Amino acid sequence: TRVWNIADSKLWYLTRDQAQGFLDLEKSPEYQEDVIKKEIDLVVMHISEILRKVGKKPINIIDLGCGDGKKAVIFIQYLKGKVRLRYCPIDISGYMVEKALDKIKRMNVGEVVEFQWNISDFENLENVSKVLRSGSFKNNLFLLLGNTLGNFETHELLYNVRNSMGDGDIILIGNGLNNHKVEDDIVRSCRENPLRDEFFSLILQLAGFKKNQIQYGVRFRNDRLETFYTILSDISLSFQDRTIEFYKGDQIVVAFAYHYEKSEFMSYLKMYFGNVQLHVLEDSSYTLALCKK
């Protein structure tokens, strides 16, 4: 079997339809159960400790992979009236950034930063944090929630984030873990969620495939959840003066999400941050990591 790997989250949001498709997926009962509810439960359980770490000084909240801003809302609600804050959403999708800016502005809790770096990948983070660290806003709280870290090559993203942080800056990371029940729980849930197929198939449809030429699949291997499509018949796709031949049975990997074992995840975080605390759900399926540089 030939396997083509085009798993790059930049391809998820090339159009507004794709971005909205992801927001629709997030609302599905399966996604709510697998990611959002788990993360919110951990945040609520440990919010006092997180706020203690954040302190009372004015703070920039830098929301990495902001989506429509809802992941940041819970923190901003708790911080409201306690500290001066500025909110800065970062996302590759301009559509997502618009939604996040609008949502947080309506909360009326502090300054919302709109500048050229809002729509950006995570390679430009150093520019972001330097610009924001001005006046009385010397401290940054980075949010990397909703399994966003898992959708990237772990060390590359952690390296970029750490390089953009100043001494004393904090990052909060929400990510799934491998509790040796991923196959029964997450894989099955993802396979049975039609909105996942609807969302990820858009990538291949933009490339020229028809929906009836591909078959959705999910598997867990090498510490990561892979979403892939199997080609159902021979097909050639042409663009400009180039043609690519795909054969029946070929597989195209369109997305991955790393789920490490707790000890392995901890060891990776300790490579980049001096102070790391892991808060883990009782079933060891999800963690909230509070890290300080």
Model-derived segments and spans:
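Conserved beta-strand signature within the Rossmann-like core of class I S-adenosyl-L-methionine
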Residues: 165-181
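Substrate-binding/catalytic lobe of Class I Rossmann-like enzymes that use SAM or dcSAM, i.e.
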Residues: 191-273
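The AdoMet/dcAdoMet-binding core of the Class I SAM-like
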Residues: 93-95, 183-190
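A short, conserved alpha-helix within the catalytic core of class I
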Residues: 150-163
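Conserved S-adenosyl-L-methionine
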Residues: 274-283
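Rossmann-like AdoMet
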Residues: 1-62, 69-118, 126, 132-138, ...
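Short hydrophobic/aromatic beta-strand or adjacent loop that forms the aromatic wall/cage
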Residues: 224-226, 284-290
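A conserved beta-strand element that flanks and buttresses the S-adenosyl-L-methionine
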Residues: 143-144
